[in-house]
Amino acid sequence: YSYADAITNYLHLKEKNKFLSEENAKLLSLTQRQDHTKFESKNISNDFIYKSAKVINNSINKRNNYLTINKGISHGVKEGMGVITNKGVIGIVQSSSKNYSIVISLLNNKTSIGIKLKKNNHFGILKWNGYNYKEASINNFPSHIDISLGDTIVTSSYSMIFPENVIIGTVKEINTDEGYYNILIHLFEDFNQLNYTYIVESKNIIEKKILEKSIRNE
């Protein structure tokens, strides 16, 4: 088993991973369409399209972290699109060039994600705590809500950036503060090992923004 063989196998594995990521993106879009047909009254995921992208730069040790992915305007990527993996939310596209995009990481003080408890659908806001790339926080969560260590946190239906029920993490620690809980979340995704991601495009986000703007103007 020579050095040349090792290099050849490594390159083959990279190409295989890229192919699998692209195929998974296609399957996600197809599956969401099928799920919507079957569970139309409960599932809005048909409103999203998925594109695969590779992370080519990433930071985790700053107060405000960003990552770069290898898809841009020529691939249909736009500002405001969500970025996820099969282990959770990664961030939101901030800007794009022809072939690349900068993503505001979940590990960034500017990022807030609408979440809910999977077991009872109670809503909250998730933000990074600024210290550990494996953890995030939910603050000012009502203390009368049933929540326990190990409970799963997923995305809520309030955002049109991410599909509902994308996994995020589990409850690691619960602290009480004047009638509220401050909750520490262990993230499923390891941001130090990001490779392939999925860009999430909402087909109805413009319509939603226009409708909600008309209400705010009243």
Which residues does each PLM region occupy?
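Extracytoplasmic/periplasmic terminal helices and flexible tails
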Residues: 1-74, 78-218
